[in-house]
């Protein structure tokens, strides 16, 4: 494991294959028809892997729309059925996650990010 922080914290191979994580964050987002976004800023340390899952008994809708912030801008929408959770995103350096879904009642999605 690395003894320092920042871009040079890991060996070249660890940094290249993206398989080493320095830390992780977990955040619950409540979806009720409006967009919910991760509150913590990941710009200085983007997530190498993001996992979305729903705690038991919290989902009653059909789909969720995911929007990822990569390189300072949000990209296209990704639509995922709740039946497909947990959902893992790898291979991108994600700075933030925005989720839309729900139709009045509160649906809770947990965003687990590895940095």
Model-flagged regions — what are they?
Residues 48-50, 89-107:
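Noncatalytic modules at the cell exterior or secretory-pathway interfaces
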Residues 4-8, 46, 60-62, 104-108:
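Short loop/turn segments at connectors of secondary-structure elements within structured domains
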């Amino acid at each position: 494991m690395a003894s320092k922080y920042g871009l040079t914290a890991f060996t070249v191979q660890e940094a290249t294959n993206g398989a080493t994580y320095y830390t992780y964050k977990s955040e619950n987002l409540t979806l009720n028809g409006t967009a919910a976004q991760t509150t913590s800023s990941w710009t200085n340390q983007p997530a190498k892997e993001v996992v979305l899952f729903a705690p038991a008994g919290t989902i009653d809708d059909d789909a969720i729309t995911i929007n990822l912030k990569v390189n300072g801008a949000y990209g296209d929408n990704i639509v995922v059925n709740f039946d497909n959770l947990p959902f893992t995103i790898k291979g991108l350096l994600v700075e933030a996650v925005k989720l839309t879904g729900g139709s009045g009642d509160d649906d809770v999605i947990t965003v687990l990010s590895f940095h």
